[in-house]
Amino acid sequence: MRLTRYFMPVLRENPAEAQIVSHRLMLRAGMIKQNAAGIYSWLPLGFKVLRKLENIVHEEQIRAGHVPMLMPTMQSADLWRESGRYDAYGPEMLRIRDRQDRDMLFGPTNEEMITDIFRSHVSSYKDLPLTLYHIQWKFRDEMRPRFGVMRGREFFMKDGYNFDLTKEDALHAYNRHLVSYLRTYERMGLQAIPMRADSGPIGGDDTHEFLVLADTGESEVFYDSAVTDLTFGDRDIDYDSVEQCQGVMEEFTNLYARTDETHDQALFAAIPAERQRQARGIEVGQIFYFGTKYSDAMGAKVQGPDGKPTAVHMGSHGIGVSRLVGAIIEASHDEKGIIWPEGVTPFHCGIVNLKQGDTEADAACDALYASLRALGLDPLYDDRKERAGGKFATMDLIGLPWRITVGPRGLKNGVVELTSRKTGESSELPPEEAIEKIAKIYAPHHVSGNL
């Protein structure tokens, strides 16, 4: 994309309403615009990141054997009355009445709707196990929306639901989701720690939240520092293997890690003092097992092997996709701006022309731009007639991992400058070598065209 043809309304000054780094940088980088309290338009740069995160979530869900679908944002209140949650959910639920005087709601979650879909179409244990998921906009009428997309009223979320014949099968689904989430977050350049948590209004006995450690996090957390040394890496997991998924589950949850709602001081005190940590974290996902809570209430049953009807065991699993954008920025920034991990960057690299209008510099930039695009990469070419300092400041603010700087002096020596946003280190090399290096860097990140 050429910057002269792109819509990226960057701000020079820090917005007064922004209280945390991610909110400030998303506004300054022209990623979002607030339309109402806790409700944002996603401008092109922010939308690209949001879509990249969504694609990663889809890829990892499908890898785990989960089936994508799409449910509506509007739901009938009757389903929620059936489960008993319509009155219990509280004022966070936006209740609406249509022209036929029917009670509706803007869905904050989808347990009731997915249970209704399941009971309408599945009647035999032979159709199990089954996990369905979708990625959709949700609405929760927060009393005090704040911190930009971190605590908004409208948010983009992946929620999945598993249906199993037995508790053992459902707990395997729970472990399978934990494994898929670990893969998902690592692909995004995040370390998200699974922590024992409270189930809240969704209910159930087993639940883990995935938290990214950050000073601006709303959750107080207590953990054994050894959990921060755990990485999933590139291990190949058979999601159908109970033993493999259980092994990963135990590896990542046996060490103490809990939110304040479930914190046990006695257990925490048993950790060696030098490994005890108390910090703050940003919740970016949660998994639940809630047994037959919804299937009992809503009659979601299948005919078992013995021919008798039996209520299915269920779980739900969520990832806050829009919140992840803010969480990544909170975890990866400096005083100049955002530092995007290579797996989620909106553009793979930036091209800065130091002398726009110079025939040789323009031609070299055009050639770089065309070559990168031919390899399936997505560069952002700053072709504005702007001073070099302004171009560098823009690139630093929006945080692209790599910048290729092209100027007449370097071209006389047959080189361009390649700079890492993360380290600030630069090297001079021929244009074709810069292209080759960028291509190698992004080879592991599933480059599949431009969004």
From Swiss-Prot:
Gene3D superfamilies: Anticodon-binding domain, Bira Bifunctional Protein, Domain 2
UniProt-listed SUPFAM superfamilies: Class II aaRS ABD-related (SSF52954), Class II aaRS and biotin synthetases (SSF55681)
Enzyme nomenclature, EC number: 6.1.1.15
Cell location: Cytoplasm
CDD domains xrefs: ProRS_anticodon_short, ProRS_core_prok
Principal place of residence: cytoplasm
MF GO annotations: ATP binding; proline-tRNA ligase activity
Catalytic reaction list: tRNA(Pro) + L-proline + ATP = L-prolyl-tRNA(Pro) + AMP + diphosphate
GO cellular component: cytosol
Alphabetized InterPro entries for the sequence: aa-tRNA-synt_IIb, aa-tRNA-synth_II, aa-tRNA-synth_II/BPL/LPL, Anticodon-bd, Anticodon-bd_dom_sf, Pro-tRNA-ligase_IIa, Pro-tRNA_synthetase, Prolyl-tRNA_ligase_IIa_type2
Pfam hit, one: tRNA-synt_2b
Subunit structure comment from the entry: Homodimer.
Entry similarity comment: Belongs to the class-II aminoacyl-tRNA synthetase family. ProS type 2 subfamily.
Protein name: Proline--tRNA ligase
